[in-house]
Amino acid sequence: MDKEPITSAGLESLKEELIFLKEKKRPEIVAAISEARSHGDLKENAEYHAAKEEQSHNEGRIAQINDIIARANVIDVTKLNNDGKVIFGSTVDLENLDTGEKITYKIVGRDEADLQKKLIFFQSPIGKGLIGKNKNDLVEIKTPAGVRNFEIKNVKYI
C-alpha cells in the first residue's frame, strides 16, 4: 500500500466528512429505505431503489475515505524546514504575467485537490512547475490550456 501525501487540514476535512457520512447520512438513508419498504411492492418502488442507490454511493464514499486515511502520509508544512521554497503544503501567491491576474494556490495531495477551492495537486502541471521555486521567481508552465507565465509573489507555510 503506497502512502499518499496529504496536508493536516486535508486529513481533518476527510475525518469530518467520514463522521458526517457515518453518523448523519447513513441513518437518514436507512430511515428512507425503511419508509420506502413500508409502501409495499419493492419491484416498482422508485423511492426504495433511489434510497438503495444512495446507500451504495454513501457506503462507497465511506470505504474510499477509510482507504485514503489508511494510506495517508500527513505532512505538516508548518514543521518543515522550507528555506522559502515552494513545497508540498505551501500556499503560493502568483501573478499571471500574461493576464495580470493575481491568484493564490495551495499545493496539496491528490485526494484533497479541488481547483474551485484553489487547492492544486502537487503533481499537476502547475504544481510541478511551482515545487522547488522561490519568491520572485518567474516560471513558465505548460498546461493543457497552453503555456502560462507566472511570477511567484509570496510563499506561505500555513
Language model: regions and residue ranges:
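Non-DNA-binding regulatory cores of transcription-related proteins
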Residues: 75-150, 156
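Residue-level signal for pocket-adjacent positions within structured domains
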Residues: 1, 16, 37, 69-70, ...
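N-terminal cationic and glycine-rich segments that engage phosphates or anionic surfaces
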Residues: 1-63
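Structured, basic alpha/beta domains of bacterial-type, RNA-associated proteins
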Residues: 61-80
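Generic alpha-helical hydrophobic packing signal
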Residues: 52-55, 68, 140-142, 149-151
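Short hydrophobic/aromatic patches at helix-to-coil boundaries
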Residues: 3, 155-158
